[in-house]
């Protein structure tokens, strides 16, 4: 099968890659580009572990073809921290112990980042709704919601 050449922007950097027409963006990110933060939990878009932001829209990268990233902006968990400085969401997830095994954590962080970009002062209900596409089998959701609430407060003051 002939490869597809793709030029895109990932976490602010121009990136070019060659992928197969049927290869998912998740597989491209992980296997071709070494960006292993997004995880494959289900492969059907049900769990949110592979969440990324594509042109300011939260998507499951397991449902997007790698070729569809042509000319678009991709944001992954790897782009959240700046050097050793964690994003406020990452910091608050640590402080609130809002993670355990870590499989779901990158997806939750990206979904929360997307939510707060669109709604910087969400209610608890809005946070729960905004994160409803992400599943956690270990920690539960209360610590995650509290971490997002706390991060929203910090980010408003920044």
Report the location of each language-model feature.
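Signature of N-terminal electron-transfer/Fe-S-associated modules in redox systems
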Residues: 1-158
